[in-house]
């Protein structure tokens, strides 16, 4: 069993209630399909309603399951090319090794990362290293799990400056229908979240964050309600009086529609509200 989350996935259930089912100020189309030879294709396009700017990306993925290899190619409209090669569960159960490279043809810029992660039932660890001869940055994280309790640490070290550039701690508790997550980033940013699955139809989440030396406290409440197996409603509000509403409908198997709106509660009659439209297609 390798079910201990990574550091970035701590508190993920609460984040999903706040983030999924919304797409304010944009029209978005996602398409996923798989060829007969096993190559997975996914493409996404965005058009922002306030600026009119459009962007998109294409990703292809091919897995050689017998050898634990996955090859991924990425391209976006900024003309950035990415290649990722990963080896998983072959050298050891729960071990994943990845080489991730990026190339920008317009400028000739090249960059890359070496990644390694290892997951077991009671812990998970990982490290990334930038491929930079001027002085790579080393990233590392670790999560320990014991009887539902989770403790995590995340750091990054800039070898060129011999300086610790990131120093984060997290502590949480995870049960079947309840999750608690707290974190401290660089000793100055504090935050916490609570996730509660009330029943099979209702999920709720609370998020709180503040910065030391500042009166800027951020607080939000979010909920998701499943009307049936095809339809769900989402809503959230924060202490800045920004109200988010979302509606998701599965029109048919493989076709999903998302409508969302962001309302400024302090300036309701002044306009400036945002709406969003999203399509997800899978074949």
UniProtKB/Swiss-Prot annotation:
It is found in: Mitochondrion outer membrane; Membrane. The modification Phosphoserine is found at residue 241. Keywords: Acetylation, Ion transport, Isopeptide bond, Membrane, Mitochondrion, Mitochondrion outer membrane, NAD, Nucleotide-binding, Phosphoprotein, Porin, Transmembrane, Transmembrane beta strand, Transport, Ubl conjugation. NAD(+) binds at residues 242-244, 260-264. GO terms for biological process: sperm mitochondrial sheath assembly; spermatogenesis. It catalyses: chloride(in) = chloride(out); K(+)(in) = K(+)(out). The keyword Transport applies. Interacts with ARMC12 in a TBC1D21-dependent manner. Interacts with MISFA. This is Non-selective voltage-gated ion channel VDAC3. It comes from Sus scrofa (Pig).
């Amino acid at each position: 069993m390798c079910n201990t989350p990574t550091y970035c996935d701590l508190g993920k259930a609460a984040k999903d209630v706040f983030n999924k089912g919304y797409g304010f100020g944009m029209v978005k189309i996602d398409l996923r399909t798989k060829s007969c030879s096993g190559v997975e294709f996914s493409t996404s396009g965005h058009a922002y309603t306030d600026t009119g700017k459009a962007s998109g990306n294409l990703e292809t993925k091919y897995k050689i399951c017998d050898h634990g290899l996955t090859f991924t190619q990425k391209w976006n409209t900024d003309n950035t090319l990415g290649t990722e090669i990963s080896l998983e569960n072959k050298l050891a159960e729960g071990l994943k090794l990845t080489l991730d490279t990026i190339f920008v043809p317009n400028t000739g810029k090249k960059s890359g990362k070496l990644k390694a992660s290892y997951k077991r039932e009671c812990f998970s660890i990982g490290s990334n290293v930038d491929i930079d001869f001027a002085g790579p940055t080393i990233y590392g994280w670790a999560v320990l799990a014991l009887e539902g309790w989770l403790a995590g640490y995340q750091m990054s070290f800039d070898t060129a400056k011999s300086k610790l550039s990131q120093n984060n701690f997290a502590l949480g508790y995870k049960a079947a229908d309840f999750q608690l997550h707290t974190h401290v980033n660089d000793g100055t940013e504090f935050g916490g979240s609570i996730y509660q699955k009330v029943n099979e139809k209702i999920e709720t989440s609370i998020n709180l964050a503040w910065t030391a030396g500042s009166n800027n406290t951020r607080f939000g409440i979010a909920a998701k309600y499943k009307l049936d197996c095809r339809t769900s409603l989402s809503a959230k509000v924060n202490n800045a009086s920004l109200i988010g509403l979302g509606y998701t409908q599965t029109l048919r198997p493989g076709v999903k529609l998302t409508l969302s709106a962001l309302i400024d509660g302090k300036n309701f009659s002044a306009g400036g509200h945002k709406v969003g439209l999203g399509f997800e297609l899978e074949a």
